[in-house]
UniProtKB/Swiss-Prot annotation:
Gene: rpoC
GO-annotated molecular function: DNA binding; DNA-directed RNA polymerase activity; magnesium ion binding; zinc ion binding
Keyword Acyltransferase: no
Gene3D superfamilies, per database record: 1.10.132.30, 1.10.150.390, 1.10.1790.20, 1.10.40.90, 2.40.40.20, 2.40.50.100, RNA polymerase II, clamp domain, RNA polymerase Rpb1, domain 3
Protein's name in the database: DNA-directed RNA polymerase subunit beta'
The protein's assembly and partners: The RNAP catalytic core consists of 2 alpha, 1 beta, 1 beta' and 1 omega subunit. When a sigma factor is associated with the core the holoenzyme is formed, which can initiate transcription.
Pfam families in alphabetical order: RNA_pol_Rpb1_1, RNA_pol_Rpb1_2, RNA_pol_Rpb1_3, RNA_pol_Rpb1_4, RNA_pol_Rpb1_5
Cofactor needs: Mg(2+); Zn(2+)
Species annotation: Streptococcus pyogenes serotype M5 (strain Manfredo)
Catalytic activity from the UniProt record: RNA(n) + a ribonucleoside 5'-triphosphate = RNA(n+1) + diphosphate
Sorted UniProt keywords: DNA-directed RNA polymerase, Magnesium, Metal-binding, Nucleotidyltransferase, Transcription, Transferase, Zinc
Top-rank EC class of the record's enzyme: transferase
């Protein structure tokens, strides 16, 4: 067997007849499969053991030779070689066709490769191949045109006219084969190149297409006549199996039926030819053979598909590859794996961040081989077989061994759908009773898991390397940050938030207020014994917490705090300031001075002078976690998170918050507010009846009135709420629910949307506490149902978007340290009108500068060129008043097939500089796809009457951008740089004309009357600027401006959609995707290169082709950039394996075979398909080829504080 990991590349070509014969182990002559009496394969049939190998290991068909010792002997009685039965998956046979047959992929594909090679129309080809017309092959001395078609009648007439043998005309695939053999590739190519110099329009397009195909044949060494088959390969029998079902019936693969038809027809044709049957009968049989082979290769491509029982179309060879159930996606890209299990999940509140609970029964099955090895090593059993019996019997001793085996052996947990890389994480297993897997509550957010019946899969990494990678790279405790935005993904939620909220509440006048304690223990003791309340404000000696970063003037004082906050701060990392107020100043700069008693001051006096602080909410906890991570990195953060979780659960249990109907407050003046609204609506309707407003205006006014009424109720609710009300606490802390839920419980439900999407004028006046009337209930059910269907549709849409994104960017990997480019990207804050979508500070964090940044006023250099911009540095740059900075960007990176570390910046998931080998393309795709489900499905109307276009938003807009479609509501853009000199309105055509005066001439643009203008007379506009509101068509922008402007525009547009929905995504992810859409160019003029005009190629390949020509002083080729949607870009990738496994499998393979394409296995997908280690992360050559060194050869790293991660990477490099 070939060692997959030694592959350099993989090529696909057309198979020549001699190649097919060399694969074959014998000819299949009979359509029989197996003998139904003996169940043995028939001789010379489709399952013949002589051709394909024995059905049982080391045993010939007749049973003369059995056992491995006869390996390699061919039995003299039955002719079967004694070998493994596995060869029945590898050995092929063949069928010698009695008449040539065209291959349907090359004849029927779009464009028809046969048609282009011969310069014949597909329809003409079809007539010839299926025996409806003759084609002139050699006119000899007659005036007939070569390749012209003759009907049966015309053929006879011409024969009589010119005499027999005066010209050659044939029908069927044989004729096509003769024509293909006559094609002189070199001469045709030269002729077409000449033609291209003068041709234009349709003629030129056709010439370019023919040239493309002929050139492909010429370069690849494939012969055009191989598109017609004389010999048909038969795939190995174990790939088209026959299985016996209960009851003696057989289930067989459809391919066997299709092969049987071919063999039957082929044998019948052979017999007819032997008998010298009449031509018409032979022709008919040849046509049927042609159709049988078509059905075998691609059933249903031409005419009606051949059906099996129950009129189900049979699955042909092409169907075996296509689609989700095809070979590529079902078996090569996603396999079922051993050592895996699946179970329902339950919460494990006592687990540590790096642990998960595994039921004993699952663990013993998953770790069976490890346990058996230990049993034999401890000599509890003599051999593996006995050990296996011990495990299956459930011997008492196996449980202790299991405990040993799983120690330090991480397992992987995965929850479907795996939307991003945090959907699979590693944990150390802890054995538990019961049958459910136990999951740490904090990792739920990353998995998007809850405990209402979700299931998860568990996998065991087997090899030492796999275990090391799971522990070092995938351990859940290491994944604190979300790769999409670099914010913590493990923020506490629900009970944990509620517990910490309750713990940090303050209350005036509670028992024990004003007591002073010498240290934490005394305070806790007072609280436990009922002398002080959790919320009462008390004093504590500062010097009892010597490790906190106090200011010098605070160290010897007494500080005012609450018992709860003493407990809360006790779990904080030591070097974090004492948290007294839930704000960033306290977190970053230290505890404010107002909480400290001056010597001799009365504590009650200070307490009375202080305001009551609000408790710590979910957002504040998130900020604390982010700060902890920034200062202390992973290990300390995950330990702190566990303490925070335990404290939260403990105190939410103690608080015992419950919610009942009596906790929903009643708004005293609800009736007044609603009466006033009714009154206002009546006035509006009166005005409408008098003709003072249009129906549209009335509708807007009515809906606005009810909206304002609802807001008034909401406002009243917030004003009158009691902060100790459990519902209010739940909402305010961020544990669950928000103000709109609260206002539906206590205020009014408000306006509802009708099924047509329009808002109904009749609002629902009741709230859930009062209960809804039947009519109100009926109105509100539509919204609920629409919500459910929307979610279902959105999930599918978002999943498909992620798949396309992953496909287009899967080969973008960090390939080198620095590409040395001299280009950069000038960035500023992204704005939408007056609103800031993304600030400059956010965009700068974690990027490298391209040029140094100077203070705009003092001229002082804030940061040099090619330096990493940290969070603090970004703030400093923005505070200095800098508005734009030139940074290194993925857009301008010069690395081939990937990105370099400097152009990418930090890895958001770790907060450190990105490592070489990181698969940033896949991470980018997941980061953009994963929040897709949070985007809305709706396309909004923009405010009533003002505009005549719909503006697409949410998920449809993201798809529109990434597929580079023409947007809905397109903006008119200018092609000249200059000033707007005039905007004239033309009432007759209902349009406006905008005139822009540039240096070279005047630009005149017609825009619809109703369009909102973005420019006024006198404005200065750049090329490609939008004159009206709406989305710019990116392909149009590319014609007017350069690639970088288009990339910048697309980046800003994607960010606008996501930010408007409150989803943050790092710029670099969008940059990676957009760069992939613009990596191809189309050759315009080939110059002195041997490129063909109109060819689509990678920018790097194009530059290479020009390099040699420029050096030798020739004329280089010219090209223009092409913007491709992600689906098209995936299919145009250089790897045919990746493209074929994505979509349009047959088209991709047809094209690749003709070109004799080589797949250099650079991306991830192609390596997964052939089963090779992927060239990313630890699979990169630079990590795999490391030679182990003796310790004395390695330079010792300085013994400053080096974290475990740093040591690991230093060794890896």
């Amino acid at each position: 067997m070939v060692d997959v990991n030694r592959f350099k590349s993989m090529q696909i070509t057309l198979a020549s007849p001699s190649k097919v014969r060399s694969w074959s182990y014998g000819e299949v002559k009979k359509p029989e499969t197996i003998n139904y009496r003996t169940l043995k394969p028939e001789r010379e049939g489709l399952f013949d053991e002589v051709i394909f190998g024995p059905t049982k290991d080391w045993e010939c068909a007749c049973g003369k030779y059995k056992r491995i010792r006869y390996k390699g002997i061919v039995c003299d009685r039955c002719g079967v070689e004694v070998t493994r039965a596995k060869v029945r998956r590898e050995r092929m046979g063949h069928i010698e066709l009695k008449a040539p047959v065209s291959h349907i992929w090359y004849f029927k594909g779009i464009p028809s490769r046969m048609g282009l090679t011969l310069d014949m129309s597909p329809r003409a080809l079809e007539e010839v191949i299926y025996f409806a017309a003759y084609v002139v092959i050699d006119p000899k001395d007659t005036p007939l045109e070569p390749k012209s078609l003759l009907t049966e009648r015309e053929y006879r007439e011409k024969l009589q006219e010119y005499g027999h043998g005066s010209f050659v005309a044939k029908m069927g695939a044989e004729a096509i084969q003769d024509l293909l053999k006559r094609v002189d590739l070199a001469a045709e190519i030269a002729e077409l190149k000449e033609e291209l110099k003068s041709a234009s329009g349709q003629k030129r397009i056709k010439a370019v297409r023919r040239l493309d195909v002929l050139d492909a044949f010429n370069k690849s060494g494939n012969k055009p006549e191989w598109m017609v088959l004389n010999i048909l390969p038969v795939i190995p029998p174990d790939l088209r199996p026959m299985v016996q079902l209960d009851g003696g019936r057989f289930a067989a693969s459809d391919l066997n039926d299709l092969y049987r038809r071919v063999i039957n027809r082929n044998n019948r044709l052979a017999r007819l030819l032997e008998l010298n049957a009449p031509g018409i009968i032979v022709q008919n049989e040849k046509r049927m053979l042609q159709e049988a082979v078509d059905a075998l290769i691609d059933n249903g491509r031409r005419g009606r598909p051949i059906t099996g029982p129950g009129s189900r179309p049979l699955k042909s060879l092409s169907h075996m590859l296509k689609g989700k159930q095809g070979r590529f996606r079902q078996n090569l890209l996603g396999k079922r794996v051993d050592f895996s299990g699946r179970s329902v999940i339950a919460v494990g509140p006592t687990l540590k961040m790096y642990q998960c609970g595994v039921p004993r029964e699952m663990a013993i099955e998953l770790f069976k081989p490890f346990v058996m090895r230990e049993i034999v090593a401890k000599e509890y059993a003599g051999n593996v077989k006995a050990a296996k019996r011990m495990v299956e019997r459930g011997d008492e001793r196996i449980w202790d061994i299991l405990e040993e085996v799983i120690k330090e052996h991480p397992v992987l947990l995965n929850r479907a759908p795996t939307l991003h890389r945090l959907g699979i994480q590693a944990f150390e297993p802890v054995l538990i009773d019961g049958k459910a897997l136990r999951l740490h509550p904090l990792v739920c957010e990353a998995y998007n898991a809850d405990f209402d019946g979700d299931q998860m899969a568990i996998h065991v990494p087997l090899s030492e390397e796999a275990q090391a990678e799971a522990r070092l790279l995938m351990l859940a405790a290491e994944h604190i940050l979300n790769p999409k935005d670099g914010k913590p993904v493990v923020t506490p939620s629900q009970d944990m938030v509620l517990g910490n909220y309750y713990l940090t509440m303050e209350d005036a006048g509670r028992e024990g207020e004003g007591m002073i304690f010498k240290d934490k223990d005394e305070a806790v003791m007072a609280y436990r014994n009922g002398y002080a309340h959790l919320h009462s404000r008390v004093g504590i000696a500062v010097d009892s917490m010597p490790n906190k970063p106090w200011k010098d003037n605070q160290r010897l004082k007494i500080m005012v705090t609450t018992v709860g906050k003493i407990l809360f701060n006790d779990i904080m990392p030591e070097d974090l300031p004492y948290l007294q107020e839930p704000n960033n100043a306290n977190l970053t700069e230290g505890t404010p001075d107002k909480y400290f008693l001056e010597p001799g001051q009365d504590i009650q006096e200070v307490i009375d002078g202080l305001e009551i602080n609000v408790p710590f909410k979910k957002k504040n906890l998130g900020n604390i976690i982010a700060e902890t991570f920034k200062r202390f990195r992973t290990t300390e953060t995950s330990a702190f998170l566990d303490r925070l979780k335990d404290l939260g659960y403990y105190h939410s249990t103690l608080a015992g918050l419950t919610v009942g109907i009596a906790d929903i407050p009643v708004i005293d003046n609800k009736a007044e507010i609603i009466d006033a609204a009714h009154h206002r609506v009546e006035e509006i309707n009166k005005a409408f009846r008098r003709g003072l407003m249009t129906d549209d205006d009335r509708y807007v006014a009515v809906t606005t009135t009810w909206r304002e009424a609802k807001e008034a109720l909401e406002k009243r609710l917030i004003e009158t709420q009691n902060p100790k009300n459990p519902i209010v606490m739940m909402m305010d802390s961020g544990a669950r629910g928000n103000i709109s839920n609260f206002s539906q419980l206590a205020g009014m439900r408000g306006l509802m949307a009708a099924p047509n999407g329009r808002i109904m004028e009749l609002p629902i006046l009741s709230n859930f506490r009062e209960g809804l009337s039947v009519l109100e209930m009926f109105f509100s059910t539509h919204g609920a149902r629409k919500g459910m269907t929307d979610t279902a549709l959105k999930t599918a849409d978002s999943g498909y978007l992620t798949r396309r994104l992953v496909d287009v960017a899967q080969d973008v990997i960090i390939r080198e340290d620095d590409c040395g480019t001299d280009r950069g990207l000038l960035i500023r804050a992204i704005t939408d009108g007056k609103e800031v979508t993304e600030t400059l500070e956010e965009r700068l964090q974690g990027r490298y500068t391209r040029k140094s940044v100077k203070h705009p006023e003092t001229g002082e250099v804030l940061i040099g060129a090619d330096q990493l911009i940290t969070e603090d540095m970004a703030r400093k740059i923005v505070d200095a008043g800098v508005e734009e900075v030139t940074i290194r960007s993925v857009f301008t990176c010069a690395t081939r097939h990937g990105v370099c570390r400097h152009c990418y910046g930090i890895n958001l998931a770790t907060g450190d500089a990105v490592e070489v080998g990181e698969a940033v393309g896949t991470i980018a795709a997941q980061s953009i796809g994963e929040p897709g489900t949070q985007l809305t499905m709706r396309t909004f109307h923009t405010g009533g009457v003002a505009s005549n276009t719909d503006i697409t938003q949410g998920l449809p807009r993201i798809q529109e951008i990434f597929e580079a479609r023409n947007p809905k509501g397109e903006a008119v853009i200018t092609e000249v740089k200059g000033n707007v000199v005039e905007i004239e309105e033309d009432a007759s055509t209902r349009t406006k004309k905008v005139y822009v005066q540039g240096k070279t001439g005047m630009g005149e643009y017609v825009v619809p009357f109703t369009a909102r203008m973005k420019v006024e007379v006198g404005d200065e506009v750049n090329r490609g600027a939008a004159l009206t509101e709406g989305s710019i068509q990116p392909k149009r922008l590319l014609e007017v401006r350069d690639t970088l402007s288009v990339e910048t525009y697309l980046l800003a547009e994607v960010q606008k959609v996501y930010r408007s929905q409150g989803v943050e995504i790092g710029d670099k992810h969008v940059e990676v995707m957009v760069r992939q859409m613009l990596r191809k160019v189309r050759v315009m003029d080939p110059g002195d290169t041997d490129l063909l005009p109109g060819t689509l190629m990678d920018i790097s390949d194009f530059t290479d082709a020009n390099k040699d020509i420029v050096i030798s002083g020739g004329i280089p080729a010219t090209s223009r950039p092409v913007l491709m949607g992600i689906t098209k870009a995936s299919l145009e990738t250089n790897s045919f394996l990746s493209a074929a496994s994505f979509q349009e499998t047959t088209r991709v393979l047809t094209d690749a075979a003709i070109r004799g394409k080589k797949d250099h296995l650079l991306g991830l997908k192609e390596n997964v398909i052939i089963g090779k280690i992927i060239p990313a992360g630890t699979g990169m050559a630079r990590y795999r080829n490391i030679e182990p060194q003796a310790m004395n050869e390695i330079e010792v790293i300085d013994h400053t504080e080096v974290s475990a991660e740093a040591v690991f990477t230093a060794e890896a490099e």
